[in-house]
A protein has these predicted regions:
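A subset of signal/propeptide-processing and intrinsically disordered low-complexity segments
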Residues: 1, 17-18
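Bacterial N-terminal signal peptides that target proteins for export
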Residues: 1-7
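Carbohydrate-interacting regions of secretory-pathway proteins
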Residues: 21-198
Length: 198
């Protein structure tokens, strides 16, 4: 993985509900946006890193610096398949998500080649409590972030399906990656995305 492999500037969510759980911010209408990230710390989020107990932020992998959420492997001696995931403390099912991301830093020497300039958001996922200690990825549907490696087209926004399948227009899709029609972006460029999940 990258020593600092992607950075989130802001994460906003629009919900079709006004219900609240545990005093966390909620939208008052289906068109109101709420911030999932407070710009200060990881409040409202739970960390899960392969090989480490739920809630342990091994190596300070997920950190907030200057109001930006960063994913960093700076404190790792080696990657050793320690994939990191960050979960919101509230599960969502129907929502719109807006955020920005970019890649920075250099890949760790022992990380698998496929993780180069590769990250994403699990838009539907198994709960963090159900993930096994050494499980690399949650069973999920992932909106994949990719960046240009200088080897030709590498579009962002693919859908990946670790441990599951996808149905599109009534047809079962069993391939792991469903390619998007999005462009290829340079590695250090901020990319704005919006996802609608029904």
């Amino acid at each position: 993985m990258y020593r600092t492999y992607y950075i989130l500037a802001c994460i906003l969510l629009a919900l079709p509900t006004t219900t609240s759980a545990e005093g966390l911010p909620t939208a008052k209408s289906p068109h109101e946006w709420i911030s999932l990230f407070n710009g200060k710390d990881l409040s409202g989020w739970t960390v899960k890193i392969t090989g480490h107990p739920l809630g342990q932020n091994f190596g300070n992998t997920f950190r907030v610096e200057d109001g930006v959420l960063k994913v960093s492997y700076d404190d790792y001696k080696q990657f050793d398949n320690q994939y990191g995931h960050l979960y919101t403390d509230i599960a969502y099912s129907k929502y719109r998500l807006r955020m920005e991301y970019r890649f920075a830093g250099k890949m760790m020497p022992d990380a698998p080649k496929y993780v180069n300039l590769n990250s994403g958001i699990m838009i539907h996922s198994q709960s963090p409590q159900s993930i096994e200690l050494h499980q690399h990825f949650p069973v999920s549907l992932e909106f994949q972030f990719l960046a240009d490696e200088g080897k030709g087209r590498r579009q962002t926004g693919n859908v990946c399906t670790p441990g599951t399948n996808l149905e599109i227009d009534g047809k079962l899709i069993t391939q792991h990656i469903v390619k998007s029609s999005a462009p290829t972006f340079p590695a250090h460029e901020w990319v704005a995305i919006e996802i609608e999940v029904q």
